[in-house]
Amino acid sequence: TLAAIRDALAKPALWEDGGATAKGRAKAAKNNLQARLSDPAAKGVCETIAATILANDMVRAAALPAAIARLMLNRYDEGMEYGAHVDAPYVDGVRTDLSFTLFLSEPDEYGGGALVIDSAGAEDEIRLPAGSLILYPSSFLHRVERVTRGSRLAAVGWIKSRIRSAGQRAMLFELAGALADLAAAGAPAATRDRLANLRNNLIREFGD
């Protein structure tokens, strides 16, 4: 549960300088704390979160995951931030097609700390309730704004998709949504089967 995850991350000794894992220009931009992944509690939390994410129907439809790279647990205390950056193309040998942030703190527990994603020149500021996940292409420029009060806890990670192209993934996600809508509306099975077959064939066509 979310409460159990937060309890497991409450130990002060669990946290270290987050800049140790950043590379290139991101290293200079990163000012946060990161859970020691050698710690059994942190490792257990990461395994639980990864399994839950990969089992989620919405994530499976949107990401079509082939693999998930290691997760990181981070904490931003007052004055900490992560400047604008693009995630590395590979993490632990896994191609990063999609990045995600799972919020572990409620928005009223900290000030500032918004995840800001630059999508085609338009910026979206994201502060979601604890337990909420945002999934976005790893090619997007993004940052975490300075925390002005309290502490912001989150899990971040990366997914390799079976579909490399973000545009193709978006089309397949729309088809999955249409199939769900047709099922809810009681559409004939033959109609739904034709659309499902089309989606499966597109996955074959688009897939690596």
Locations of the language-model features?
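Non-heme Fe(II)/2-oxoglutarate
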Residues: T1-P65, M171-D208
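Catalytic core of non-heme Fe(II) oxygenases with the double-stranded beta-helix
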Residues: D57-F173
